[in-house]
Amino acid sequence: MARFVVVALLVLLSLSGLEAIQRAPKIQVYSRHPAENGKPNFLNCYVSGFHPSDIEVDLLKNGKKIEKVEHSDLSFSKDWSFYLLYYTEFTPNEKDEYACRVSHVTLSTPKTVKWDRNM
């Protein structure tokens, strides 16, 4: 009887993990300092509140992937959702556009958020 109860509990526990909650990422794009044309700065893309942890994040300049990008370690919040910070050095000017593109299982297509120099 005890063996049956243990097996039943193991089956229930394994089935409960099949329906893990998926959460779409929140994406925030901002510069470390207020933007000034010609003055070096850092472009940040903070991605938070997502689950599961598998995610792809790219910083873009004029729609093209920036290669020299660093990021924080993957971390999780009290609610077990994940967050990351991607960042790179850049020098803003009038003509270049910057953005952050995120791909995640909760998104049917990658989501791109543009940097607003006035934020």
UniProtKB/Swiss-Prot annotation:
Q: Does the keyword Transcription regulation apply?
A: no
Signal peptide residues on this chain, from the entry's feature table: 1-20
Disulfide pairs here are C45-C100
Q: Which SUPFAM superfamilies match?
A: Immunoglobulin
User: Which key words tag this protein in UniProt?
Assistant: Disulfide bond, Immunity, Immunoglobulin domain, MHC I, Secreted, Signal
Instruction: Tell me where in or outside the cell this protein is found.
Output: Secreted
Q: Which InterPro entries match?
A: B2Microglobulin, Ig-like_dom, Ig-like_dom_sf, Ig-like_fold, Ig/MHC_CS, Ig_C1-set, MHC/Immunoglobulin
One GO cellular component term, please give it: extracellular region
Q: Which domain of life is it from?
A: Eukaryota
What Pfam families would the database entry show? C1-set
Coiled-coil annotation reads none
Question: Which GO biological process categories is it annotated with?
Answer: antigen processing and presentation of peptide antigen via MHC class I; immune response
All copies of domain Ig-like C1-type, residue ranges: 25-114
> What is the protein's known function?
Component of the class I major histocompatibility complex (MHC). Involved in the presentation of peptide antigens to the immune system.
Subunit info here reads: Heterodimer of an alpha chain and a beta chain. Beta-2-microglobulin is the beta-chain of major histocompatibility complex class I molecules.
PANTHER family this protein is in? BETA-2-MICROGLOBULIN (PTHR19944:SF62), MHC CLASS II-RELATED (PTHR19944)
Say which family it is in: Belongs to the beta-2-microglobulin family.
The name this protein goes by in its record: Beta-2-microglobulin
Species this protein is from:
Aotus azarae
